[in-house]
Regions:
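Catalytic strand-loop segment that frames the active site of acyl-thioester-processing enzymes
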Residues: 17-57, 62
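Hydrophobic core residues within well-ordered beta-strands of beta-rich domains
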Residues: 19-21, 108-109, 122
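Hydrophobic beta-strand-centered segment that forms part of the acyl-chain substrate-binding groove
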Residues: 1-3, 70-111, 115
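Short, conserved beta-turn/loop elements at beta-strand boundaries and strand-helix junctions
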Residues: 29-32, 116-121
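Active-site helix/loop of acyl-thioester processing domains in fatty-acid/polyketide metabolism
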Residues: 25, 57-82
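Small/polar/charged residue-enriched interaction surfaces, especially the RNA/DNA-contacting tracks
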Residues: 3, 15, 37-39, 113
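Beta-strand-rich interaction surfaces with strong enrichment in secreted/lumenal proteins
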Residues: 10, 53, 98-100
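Short aromatic-glycine motifs in intrinsically disordered, low-complexity regions
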Residues: 4-16, 83-84
Length: 122
């Protein structure tokens, strides 16, 4: 099983700390699916202010994590000359539900799957 570490992901995405949220990507099926891990730590940048007495990862950062995982999957599956000096954007989110809070000292597991593509839009 191929695993992309954070140092591999940095080569695929323009994001840097503290906004590089995904820690690794595995179960990679090029341009189709993968699993990403976000290690939510006590010292994560959002913990101090969201919310001081009951910290949770903001939903928008969970969605951002999905976008980063999808972008890394896409860049990993393409020939480098295809994506070099280009950005991959999340084009939409349908029916997002946050059923449980994501709290510090937990591992957020994201399963991503490409469900359709149209030209350069996935």
């Amino acid at each position: 099983m191929k695993i992309l570490s954070k140092s591999d992901i940095v080569k695929l995405l323009p994001h840097r700390e503290p906004m590089l949220l995904i820690d690794n990507l595995y179960d990679i099926e090029d341009l189709k699916s993968a699993t990403a891990v976000v290690n939510v730590k006590k010292d994560s940048f959002f913990v101090k202010g969201h919310f001081p007495d009951n910290p949770v990862m903001p939903g928008v950062l969970i969605v951002e994590s999905f976008g980063q995982a999808a972008a890394a999957l896409t860049a990993h599956g393409l020939d480098k000359s295809t994506y070099e000096n280009k950005l991959v954007f999340l084009m939409g989110v349908e029916k997002a539900r946050f059923r449980n809070p994501v709290i510090p000292d937990c591992e957020l597991i994201l399963k991503i799957e490409a469900i359709r593509s149209h030209g350069r839009v996935w």
